[in-house]
Amino acid sequence: VGPGWVWGRGGAYSQGMQPIPRTIYADEHDQFRAAFRGWLDSEVVPHHEQWEHEQITPRSLWLSAGKQGFLGLTVPEQYGGGGTDDYRFAAIMAEEIGYTGVIGSGNGMTLHNDIVLPYFLGLCNDEQKQRFLPGMCAGDIIGALAITEPNTGSDVGGVRTTAVKHGDTFVVNGAKTFISNGINSDVVVTTVKTDPSAGHRGMSLLLLERGMPGFERGRNLDKMGMHAQDTAELFFTDVEVPAANLLGEEGKGFYYLMHNLAQERLGIAVGAAAVAAAAIDWTLDYTKERKAFGQPVAHFQNSKFVLAELHTETQAAQVYVDRCIELHCEGKLTAEQAAAAKYWTTELQNKVVDRCVQLHGGYGYMREYPIARAWADSRIQSIYGGTSEIMKEIVGRSLVGG
């Protein structure tokens, strides 16, 4: 493994044109990549197809990840975490999950680490940290983030779930949908309106826990892709939530969400670039072996032109993503830069996997081939975490105002 490789795996890329060397990783990152890759190969890859069929990953996988130190990388060591603020370790996990083709099985962990845990680290008081962080690092407590509602998607400020305060308790009523880790989760960072008359300034974050009376989970939603990732509806009927489960300050929920979105969108971009590179690698392998009209499919001019186009665009995207990773590690990544990264890489990911399916011919439509699973898994990338249209609105507004 070395920083000069795309993912350090070799494959078809290593047989021909070398990718542009990556310079953002050091030896300790390469060692971490090798360890995480080995864990994926031994603990996830052999079972991924079964979990895809069952549409959920077992809790034992979370316990294994926690034991190996892959959960809570940024959590202080006193709570059982890795104690690092270096985002590059999280990026490596997203890359390896994407490149290995086990997005459904691994997506829940990146959500837990990179999207949910930052709320706990930035907003929890000491009592809350003691109560939740050790379990979240060990894999005993699985986290989720509940924003989207049946009638509210991109309009985050339009959530209708309410939390009415009575003494030391909030009474929560409402519903959420499309919640990743929705079945497995033990604690859910939930957006609620504590003052419906105040618009987005009346939004707060509450920690809803498994077993609270009135907190029910709906069905495990049957998605196009990412089948091993449990995604559920959540229902709240007069759920009494202790005021001690308020995350941060009342009325600051919208601000907290906006503050954490840059890392979420960067993480999606990191994974998108990895899947695009993997799709090209799989397609190079396939087209070099598959023959038609007496020669390898890779030798046809159309195949070479398509692969050249996809390779060049993916390399350009990777350079931009790597620079965004560096900026994020320096605390300088802007919301607009993260939005641009997510928009460009996820649209490219969908383009790459679609063109690569075409080069596989009929076999590209068979789920036993990783390219078919990647095609289904990839489609959500330009939707969740902010649609491409919203990303372009953010970037466009930064350019022209309004």
Where are these regions (language model features)?
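Low-complexity, intrinsically disordered Ser/Thr/Pro- and acidic-rich segments
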Residues: 1-9
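Alpha-helical interface subdomain recognition
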Residues: 8-101, 110, 123-128, 135-140, ...
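Short glycine/proline-enriched turns and hinge-like loops at secondary-structure junctions
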Residues: 84-85, 155-157, 181-186, 199-202, ...
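Short Gly/Pro-enriched turn/cap motifs at secondary-structure boundaries
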Residues: 110, 136, 151-154, 178-181, ...
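Helix-loop "lid/cap" segments that line or gate small-molecule binding pockets
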Residues: 114-123
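A short, Trp-centered hydrophobic/proline-enriched beta-strand micro-motif
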Residues: 139-147, 191
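Flexible, small-/acidic-enriched active-site or ligand-binding loops
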Residues: 158, 211-242
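A short core secondary-structure module
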Residues: 169, 173-217
